[in-house]
């Protein structure tokens, strides 16, 4: 019973870490990386489709992405979608190839992105703590139903806290890596 609660908690906490990674990928650094465009949705035959499903996104150099659409008629739609996204990118089209140069980040922009990264990290910490709260409530319910002893409850609470500390440390590590990445010039 307690092992089920712990494994469920650990699984939910790891999902919070994965979500944090996804959010961090959407925060642009000065370097070109295809995952920056993961959230861009292109109008493709009337429906919103992820850019990765209508084109090939590659890195040309440290500051430029190259987008090769699979159909030539979708080039203007891809351009429009990139400009509409809040990434601050301006695509340049040459024939059926779209180049997306990454503008240098200003100090002000970097600080804004760091602030956003910290907010995302705090959100991940909160969701991890909510998982801990739910797990502890389940353990308390087991004690109340006299399915486990109070000693088992204390032991389980300590183990759940250790799991929580491990995942909060992962969040902190991911945040410091993202901050370092953002401050690189």
UniProtKB/Swiss-Prot annotation:
> Matching Pfam families, A to Z?
RRF
Keywords, sorted A to Z: Cytoplasm, Protein biosynthesis
Any GO BP: cytoplasmic translational termination
Q: Where in the cell is it found?
A: Cytoplasm
Which cysteine-cysteine pairs are annotated as disulfide bonds in the entry? none
Q: Name one GO molecular function term.
A: ribosomal large subunit binding
Naming one, the record's GO cellular component terms include: cytosol
- Return the InterPro entries for the record: Ribosome_recyc_fac (IPR002661), Ribosome_recyc_fac_dom (IPR023584), RRF_sf (IPR036191)
Q: Does the keyword Transcription apply?
A: no
As for family, the record states: Belongs to the RRF family.
Function of the protein:
Responsible for the release of ribosomes from messenger RNA at the termination of protein biosynthesis. May increase the efficiency of translation by recycling ribosomes from one round of translation to another.
What's the protein called, per UniProt? Ribosome-recycling factor
């Amino acid at each position: 019973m307690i092992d089920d609660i712990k494994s469920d908690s650990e699984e939910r906490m790891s999902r919070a870490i994965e979500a944090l990674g996804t959010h961090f990928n959407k925060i642009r650094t000065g370097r070109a990386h295809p995952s920056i465009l993961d959230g861009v949705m292109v109008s493709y035959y009337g429906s919103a489709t992820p850019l990765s499903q209508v084109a090939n996104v590659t890195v040309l150099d440290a500051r430029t992405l190259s987008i090769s659409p699979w159909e030539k008629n979708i080039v203007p739609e891809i351009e429009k979608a990139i400009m509409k996204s809040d990434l601050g990118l301006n695509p340049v089209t040459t024939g059926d190839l779209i180049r997306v140069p990454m503008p240098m980040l200003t100090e002000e922009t970097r600080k804004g992105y760091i602030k956003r990264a910290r907010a995302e990290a705090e959100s991940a910490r909160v969701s991890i703590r909510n998982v801990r709260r739910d797990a502890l409530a389940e353990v308390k319910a087991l004690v109340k139903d006299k399915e486990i002893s109070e000693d088992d409850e204390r032991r389980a609470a300590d183990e759940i806290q250790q799991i929580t500390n491990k995942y909060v440390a992962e969040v902190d590590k991911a945040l410091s890596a993202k901050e370092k990445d953002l401050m690189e010039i």
